[in-house]
């Protein structure tokens, strides 16, 4: 049993089989073209399904994971992203609301290639913000 993040309401526990985890991992790796040269950073606990999915995909391919307990609202989180040359990160809708508030579009992150989102739909204004204001 794994916990969802609760970003669409209250947390839920889901039962996921080994086969589901394996197939999900392979599918994400293929879609995002994750390989051993890839590097991501933790933004969610590994006991959430989405957080574990990010860890599984990168470990399966021998990619790197920057493990941190820093949060996106902390300047040191972004310094770590820059110093470690992180290529991607994931977040739930609330995470992306925070990014807008802390002026993510003004940050210098030359290594960042993409970010992923799960846990519910992004509001239309957030989608537009990231489409218009990020060079990714």
Language-model features: locations:
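Short amphipathic alpha-helical segments
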Residues: 16, 29, 53-55, 100-104, ...
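Conserved adenylate-forming
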Residues: 60-61, 68-136
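Conserved AMP-binding/adenylation subdomain of ANL enzymes
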Residues: 22-39, 47-87
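Short glycine-enriched loops at secondary-structure junctions
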Residues: 20-21, 45-46, 94
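Conserved AMP-binding A3 loop
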Residues: 1-26
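Nucleotide donor/acceptor-binding cores
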Residues: 38, 44, 113
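ABC ATPase nucleotide-binding domain signature
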Residues: 44-47, 119
């Amino acid at each position: 049993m794994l916990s969802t993040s609760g970003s669409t309401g209250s947390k839920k526990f889901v039962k996921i089989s080994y086969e589901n985890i394996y197939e999900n991992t392979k599918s994400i790796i293929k879609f995002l073209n994750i390989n051993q040269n890839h590097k991501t950073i933790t933004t969610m606990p590994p006991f959430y399904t989405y957080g574990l999915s990010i860890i599984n995909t990168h470990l399966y391919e021998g990619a790197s994971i920057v493990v941190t307990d820093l949060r996106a609202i902390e300047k040191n989180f972004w310094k770590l992203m820059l110093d470690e040359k992180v290529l991607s990160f994931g977040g739930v809708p609330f995470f992306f609301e925070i990014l807008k508030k802390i002026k993510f579009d003004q940050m210098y992150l030359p290594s960042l290639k993409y970010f992923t989102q799960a846990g519910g739909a992004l509001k239309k204004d957030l989608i537009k913000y990231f489409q218009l204001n990020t060079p990714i």
